[in-house]
C-alpha cells in the first residue's frame, strides 16, 4: 500500500521586532505552511516575507487565522459569536491571499489557530462559521482541522475538501481531543516516541490515548512545531523516518470545482 502524508507548520508568527520560530529552517522539511494573518501574530512585513519563503521552498501557502489577541498569542478562548468568527476568518484569509496573489501564487488551505482551532473542534456553530467562511471565499480551498473533530465534520458538510490533522508532539484524550497545554502530560518530549506515534497514525490509523486505550485517528496532515528548542532536529528526523518507512511526504491536492 502506498502511504502519503502532508507535513505542516504554523509559521510567520513573529511580530514587528519579535522573532518567533525558525521559519527558514523548518520550511525545508514541510509541504504546507500555515501563515499567521496579523490577529494573533504576524504583520504585513512578515506575511510578505513568509510567502516568499514558501514560494522558494515550493511549500503550499495557507492562512492561519486566529482570535484577535496578540498578547495572548491567540491561545486564550474568547466569548465570540459565530457571526464574528465568520467575519474574522474572511478578513484574515483575505490578507494572506492578497500577498500570494500579488506574487502570482494561490492560497491552498486554511487552518485556524490556537483557541479558535480548539473551539472549532468541539463547538458546532463555531466550526460551521469557519467552514462557511472558507467555502464562501473559495470552495476549492482545503480546510485543516483536528482529526475527527466538528470542524472536519462541518467542512465536509458545506462541501469543502478537508485534511484531518494530527500532532506529532501532543498527547490525546480518550475522546480524540488534544490534552490541554495546561496539563503536565500535554507534550511528548521524546523524539523516538513522537516519531513512532506518527508512523502508527499514518499506517494504522491508531494512536494510544493518555489512559492507555487505542483510539482511531485519520492522519492526512501532521503538524510539526517550529518554535521549540528541538524543533529542527525533530523535523529532520521525522522527515527521514517517514521516508524510511515508505511514506511519501507531499502537499494535499486541491480539488477544483
Swiss-Prot record:
Transmembrane segments: none annotated. The keyword ATP-binding applies. GO terms for biological process: carbohydrate metabolic process. This is 5-oxoprolinase subunit A. InterPro entries: Glyco_hydro/deAcase_b/a-brl, LamB/YcsF/PxpA-like. GO terms for molecular function: 5-oxoprolinase (ATP-hydrolyzing) activity; ATP binding. Forms a complex composed of PxpA, PxpB and PxpC. It catalyses: 5-oxo-L-proline + ATP + 2 H2O = L-glutamate + ADP + phosphate + H(+). Its EC number is 3.5.2.9. Catalyzes the cleavage of 5-oxoproline to form L-glutamate coupled to the hydrolysis of ATP to ADP and inorganic phosphate. Keywords: ATP-binding, Hydrolase, Nucleotide-binding. Belongs to the LamB/PxpA family. HAMAP family: PxpA. Pfam families: LamB_YcsF (PF03746). It comes from Oceanobacillus iheyensis (strain DSM 14371 / CIP 107618 / JCM 11309 / KCTC 3954 / HTE831).
Amino acid at each position: 500500500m502506498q502511504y502519503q502524508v502532508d507535513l505542516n507548520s504554523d509559521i510567520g508568527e513573529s511580530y514587528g521586532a519579535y522573532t518567533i520560530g525558525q521559519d527558514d529552517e523548518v520550511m525545508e522539511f514541510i509541504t504546507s505552511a500555515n501563515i499567521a494573518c496579523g490577529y494573533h501574530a504576524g504583520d504585513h512585513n512578515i506575511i510578505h516575507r513568509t510567502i516568499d519563503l514558501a514560494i522558494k521552498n515550493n511549500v503550499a501557502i495557507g492562512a492561519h487565522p486566529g482570535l484577535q489577541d496578540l498578547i495572548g498569542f491567540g491561545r486564550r478562548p474568547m466569548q465570540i459569536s459565530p457571526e464574528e468568527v465568520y467575519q474574522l476568518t474572511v478578513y484574515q484569509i483575505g490578507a494572506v491571499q492578497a500577498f500570494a496573489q500579488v506574487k502570482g501564487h494561490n492560497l491552498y488551505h486554511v487552518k485556524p489557530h490556537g483557541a479558535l482551532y480548539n473551539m472549532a473542534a468541539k463547538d458546532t456553530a463555531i466550526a460551521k462559521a469557519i467552514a462557511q467562511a472558507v467555502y464562501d471565499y473559495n470552495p476549492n480551498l482545503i480546510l485543516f482541522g483536528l482529526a475527527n473533530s466538528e470542524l472536519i465534520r462541518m467542512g465536509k458538510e458545506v462541501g469543502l475538501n478537508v485534511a484531518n490533522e494530527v500532532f506529532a508532539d501532543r498527547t490525546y484524550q480518550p475522546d480524540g481531543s488534544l490534552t490541554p497545554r495546561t496539563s503536565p502530560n500535554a507534550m511528548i518530549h521524546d523524539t523516538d516516541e513522537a516519531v513512532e506515534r506518527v508512523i502508527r497514525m499514518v499506517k494504522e490509523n491508531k494512536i494510544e490515548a493518555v489512559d492507555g486505550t487505542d483510539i482511531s485517528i485519520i492522519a492526512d496532515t501532521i503538524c510539526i512545531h517550529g518554535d521549540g528548542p528541538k524543533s529542527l532536529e525533530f523535523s529532520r528526523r521525522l522527515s527521514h523516518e517517514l521516508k524510511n518507512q515508505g511514506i511519501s511526504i507531499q502537499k494535499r491536492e486541491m480539488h477544483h470545482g
